[in-house]
UniProtKB/Swiss-Prot annotation:
Residues 350-798 are annotated as: Mediates interaction with RNF34. This is Peroxisome proliferator-activated receptor gamma coactivator 1-alpha. It comes from Homo sapiens (Human). Transcriptional coactivator for steroid receptors and nuclear receptors. Greatly increases the transcriptional activity of PPARG and thyroid hormone receptor on the uncoupling protein promoter. Can regulate key mitochondrial genes that contribute to the program of adaptive thermogenesis. Plays an essential role in metabolic reprogramming in response to dietary availability through coordination of the expression of a wide array of genes involved in glucose and fatty acid metabolism. Induction: Transcription is repressed by ZNF746 which binds to 'insulin response sequences' its promoter. The modification N6-acetyllysine is found at residues 79, 146, 184, 254, 271, 278, 321, 347, 413, 442, 451, 758, 779. Residues 677-753 form the RRM domain.
Length: 798
């Protein structure tokens, strides 16, 4: 960890000194050391060779350098004594430790922000104001190409680094190694390269060219196009610098990686060296993109020609129109820029879910405008937001007037044609509905007409895909056979019901998918009506006679609702078959009138309910939601427990009272039986009622109770309890006189157990007095001996 921190600090200070040397200014090593004298530093020593050696892209000679640093003392610090050198080392160590480190663990190079070399807005001294290099610059890339594209076996000497950078590196490594000394060695190769580079030292063009190579993402032969692109982008950046969108566009367009390492990688490179694949793209990307905090990670040199994975988010739109898109090596950038540049282009309606569903089968005409339109009719109840209509009141009035004209023209239509319109098939109703919509939309503006036509096409496609909902739209006759005799009254009703008249479309939307409709609309099988909408009572005329002037909700409320919802519930289909039965004599379909002869039960129930519950707000709900059928609601569990205990206690008390009453009745019956006041009457007719039996036997006296028990075998009987015993004896003696000519004789007994047994039983109470043990003797007991002997002889002869 200490070695990593040491390397980071040394690299940071080394980069600061190197950039200062490139700029050509005598800058202090650190702002905290103003007393450091760097006047003896020769800037001319920083030629291309030494600069390339200082960058240390490939650190194959790092060990050689570290060994050579220990040979000779430094030439720059000859005038500094050892005490000052020790103090300087301590201050440098403290300063290097205080350098900021970014999120990736690398020191941030703030010193480059003041230079004119790393910014593309300020080109190198040799470049023209418009960003194009001078003509003599065409020969210079050849030297750099030789240096950058040197073969792997070529050994570049890093010993010719500037004394300042080398001393700084050595001083920092002093914390880990021995006190390093800096030596400046020269060999034949370095002298030759230095002599070549010294011819161009006054202009410092190799350094500027090197920076151009460092900041480009293309191959070295593409240096000039890259400069042109960078210049144009820099101009755009300077004009739009205040906009963050422009900055993120520059981040996309600017290349931020190096194309090639300064020295080619050799097979024997030490991969574990701290200087492996060192790049300065992080510093350059900070300056070029214009966003100081956005520093993407370093891209390896072998991925230089691939797409930049750290481009900005594509959601940001470009505001700079002068940026030249990158070449074909980055097609994603150009595509995203071209797509994001069209700010006015919105997501087309053809990408909606409805279009995605319909486009699978056929292509609709006018596909761009028809999905933007919404339903051209008002909605009575709430629906989904994407289905609600936002038409103006003018179109509603036009549709109302058109419907009035159609209804007046077809006023005298025959009832037979009306019946035929009711039983037409769903396919014919679709075609009639489309024709009626086209005719009713002629007087509307062309825009609304086109919208309605497109809406009809969408509906036709929906019917084709998902099946036609039964009677979802009006029939041809059902839309046009309304009769309005009183125009003032009709206009009043139309003003109350504007949503039912818009060429049939509102009726579709009315019964689509609103859950509240089940509570607000009326059901013919339920006998209810929605009186929150219609406050005019039905006619009081006979229910089986057609009354054209009767005022009631439109027929569409009662018939179209269950027909529309047949697919959702089977009860709706049952009502559909019932509502079209012959019990319904005539069915007018105008919102102003309806035949009151739908069915006997329906009219009676609805008429009675309307009279009794007309102004009741609870009547809007269904009958099943009456207050009597609702369970009580409790505020707390304790209240529920209390109510439950009360109910149980009441039930126990009721059962106790009932048992007491039953016991009392049983005691009274037993007492009446003991008192001989109960008479059993048997063999009565099966059709005899209790009232008839009571009336016939009441001639003998006052009767307290009379019951009749009927049996399947015809042996019916009854019990009559008289108030007095004497009346019971009179009925027992003279009851046979009440028999009619077509009846059998009554069996009259005093009530007891004996009437429930058969008469041939020997243990019956009625036969107890006649029982005699002697009666069981045979006929032979009365014969004498001679008679018995003769009988025996006759039996033997047989």
């Amino acid at each position: 960890m200490a070695w990593d921190m040491c390397n980071q600090d040394s690299e940071s200070v080394w980069s600061d000194i190197e950039c200062a040397a490139l700029v050509g200014e005598d800058q202090p090593l650190c702002p905290d050391l103003p007393e450091l004298d760097l006047s003896e530093l020769d800037v001319n020593d920083l030629d291309t060779d030494s600069f390339l050696g200082g960058l240390k892209w490939c650190s194959d000679q790092s060990e050689i350098i570290s060994n050579q640093y220990n040979n000779e003392p430094s030439n720059i610090f000859e005038k500094i004594d050892e005490e000052n050198e020790a103090n300087l080392l301590a201050v440098l160590t403290e300063t290097l430790d205080s350098l900021p480190v970014d999120e990736d663990g690398l020191p941030s190079f703030d010193a480059l922000t003041d230079g004119d070399v790393t910014t593309d807005n300020e080109a190198s001294p040799s470049s023209m104001p418009d960003g194009t290099p001078p003509p003599q610059e065409a020969e210079e890339p050849s030297l750099l190409k030789k240096l950058l594209l040197a073969p792997a076996n070529t050994q570049l000497s890093y010993n010719e680094c500037s004394g300042l950078s080398t001393q700084n590196h050595a001083n920092h490594n002093h914390r880990i190694r021995t006190n390093p000394a800096i030596v400046k060695t020269e060999n034949s190769w370095s002298n030759k390269a230095k002599s070549i580079c010294q011819q161009q030292k006054p202009q410092r063009r190799p350094c500027s060219e090197l920076l151009k190579y460092l900041t480009t993402n293309d191959d070295p032969p593409h240096t000039k196009p890259t400069e042109n692109r960078n210049s144009s982008r820099d101009k755009c950046t300077s004009k739009k610098k205040s906009h963050t969108q422009s900055q993120s566009q520059h981040l996309q367009a600017k290349p931020t990686t190096l194309s090639l390492p300064l020295t080619p990688e050799s097979p024997n490179d030490p991969k574990g060296s701290p200087f492996e694949n060192k790049t300065i793209e992080r510093t350059l990307s900070v300056e070029l993109s214009g966003t100081a905090g956005l520093t993407p990670p370093t891209t390896p040199p072998h991925k230089a020609n691939q797409d930049n994975p750290f481009r900005a988010s594509p959601k940001l739109k470009s505001s700079c129109k002068t940026v030249v898109p990158p070449p074909s090596k980055k097609p994603r950038y150009s595509e995203s820029s071209g797509t994001q540049g069209n700010n006015s282009t919105k997501k087309g309606p053809e990408q909606s879910e409805l279009y995605a569903q319909l486009s699978k089968s056929s292509v609709l005409t006018g596909g761009h405008e028809e999905r933007k339109t919404k339903r051209p009719s008002l909605r009575l109840f709430g629906d989904h937001d994407y289905c609600q209509s936002i038409n103006s009141k003018t179109e509603i009035l036009i549709n109302i007037s058109q419907e009035l004209q159609d209804s007046r023209q077809l006023e005298n239509k025959d009832v037979s044609s009306d019946w035929q319109g009711q039983i037409c098939s769903s396919t014919d109703s679709d075609q009639c509905y489309l024709r009626e919509t086209l005719e009713a939309s002629k007087q509307v503006s062309p825009c609304s007409t086109r919208k309605q036509l497109q809406d009809q096409e969408i509906r036709a496609e929906l019917n084709k895909h998902f099946g036609h909902p039964s009677q979802a739209v009006f029939d041809d006759e059902a839309d046009k056979t309304g009769e309005l005799r009183d125009s003032d009254f009709s206009n009043e009703q139309f003003s109350k019901l504007p949503m039912f008249i818009n060429s049939g479309l509102a009726m579709d939307g009315l019964f689509d998918d609103s859950e509240d409709e089940s509570d607000k609309l009326s059901y013919p099988w339920d006998g209810t009506q929605s009186y929150s909408l219609f406050n005019v009572s039905p006619s009081c005329s006979s229910f089986n006679s057609p009354c054209r002037d009767s005022v009631s909700p439109p027929k569409s409320l009662f018939s179209q609702r269950p027909q529309r919802m047949r697919s959702r519930s089977r009860s709706f289909s049952r009502h559909r078959s019932c509502s079209r039965s012959p019990y319904s004599r005539s069915r007018s379909r105008s919102p102003g009138s309806r035949s009151s002869s739908r069915s006997c039960y329906y009219y009676e129930s609805s008429h009675y309910r309307h009279r009794t519950h007309r102004n009741s707000p609870l009547y809007v709900r269904s009958r099943s939601r009456s207050p009597y059928s609702r369970r009580p609601r409790y505020d707390s569990y304790e209240e529920y427990q209390h109510e439950r205990l009360k109910r149980e206690e009441y039930r126990r008390e009721y059962e106790k009272r009932e048992s007491e009453r039953a016991k009392q009745r049983e005691r009274q019956r037993q007492k009446a039986i003991e008192e001989r006041r109960v008479i059993y009457v048997g063999k009565i007719r099966p059709d005899t009622t209790r009232t008839e039996l009571r009336d016939r036997f009441e001639v003998f006296g006052e009767i307290e109770e009379c019951t009749v028990n009927l049996r399947d075998d015809g042996d019916s009987y009854g019990f009559i309890t008289y108030r007095y015993t004497c009346d019971a004896f009179a009925a027992l003696e003279n009851g046979y006189t009440l028999r009619r000519s077509n009846e059998t004789d009554f069996e009259l007994y005093f009530c007891g157990r004996k009437q429930f047994f058969k008469s041939n039983y020997a243990d019956l109470d009625s036969n107890s007095d006649d029982f005699d043990p002697a009666s069981t003797k045979s006929k032979y007991d009365s014969l004498d001996f001679d008679s018995l002997l003769k009988e025996a002889q006759r039996s033997l002869r047989r």
